[in-house]
Amino acid sequence: MKFRSDSSGGDEPRAPAAGDGGGGGDEPAKRQRTDPSSSSSQGEASSSSQPPPQQQQEEQPPEDAGEGEQPRVPDLGEDLVFEVLRRAEARTLAAAACVSRGWRQLAEDERLWEAACVREWANLGFSERQLRAVVLSLGGFRRLHAVYIRPLQWRGAGVPRQQGRRQPPVRLGRDQVQLSLSLFSIGFFQNMPCPKKDKGNDSDKNGGGQCG
């Protein structure tokens, strides 16, 4: 018997080998299927590494954070403050000295206290230059007002000492001013220290009498 040749068209076609070039057509399709998943995973990783825009806005400091602060008092300058305090009374000068260290140094100026004292005095009959020289040599106008003038104003107003701040300052007459100046000078000389004595005798170096 004769067998038919294998070249007949009835046989089934063989499957291409794995290493043949025919299988290369499926690889791009597989890559296209896998590329979207890999790109989506990369996008998720990049999106997770970057903070959302809302968190960035919250982390930034607000621009209007300083609106809640109290407005600062503008610096008027020492010259302008001095001219204002020069027209103030003694009570205002004492209150201004409690504002700050700079105002305290400014309020302790003897020219301000001189203006406050002379404004409340009557005409004494002698120049302000002579008065200034005497008072400054005895301790200053601020001490003169605190120790002698203010008690006279309280007594002249006829009110107790605790309520003296509620009353306006009383203008002193000529006799009261002279009395306060006399007491001021007496108090100054009473508080002067005794002169040093020699070791050999009890008399002082200038040949004066004994002290105490």
From Swiss-Prot:
Family matches, as Pfam families: F-box-like
UniProt cross-references to Gene3D superfamilies, sorted A to Z: 1.20.1280.50
Subcellular location: Nucleus
Top-level taxon of the source organism: Eukaryota
UniProt GO cellular component terms: cytoplasm; nucleus; SCF ubiquitin ligase complex
Alphabetized UniProt keyword annotations: Gibberellin signaling pathway, Nucleus, Ubl conjugation pathway
An individual GO BP term: gibberellic acid mediated signaling pathway
Keyword hit for Metal-binding: no
Residue ranges occupied by any F-box domain in the UniProt entry: 70-116
Location of region: Disordered: 1-74
Pathway per the UniProt entry: Protein modification; protein ubiquitination
Entry comment describing in which tissues the protein is expressed: Widely expressed. Preferentially expressed in unopened flowers, shoot apices and elongation stem. Expressed at lower level in the leaf blades, leaf sheaths, roots and rachis.
Low complexity bias locations: 35-59
Primary localization: nucleus
Quaternary structure and interacting proteins, as annotated: Part of some SCF(GID2) complex, which consist of a SKP1 protein, CUL1, GID2 and some RING box protein. Interacts directly with SKP2 and SKP15. Interacts directly with DELLA protein SLR1. May have a higher affinity for phosphorylated SLR1 proteins.
Function description: Essential component of some SCF-type E3 ligase complex that positively regulates the gibberellin signaling pathway. Upon gibberellin treatment, the complex mediates the ubiquitination and subsequent degradation of DELLA protein SLR1, a repressor of the gibberellin pathway, leading to activate the pathway.
Full protein name: F-box protein GID2
Lineage: Eukaryota, Viridiplantae, Streptophyta, Embryophyta, Tracheophyta
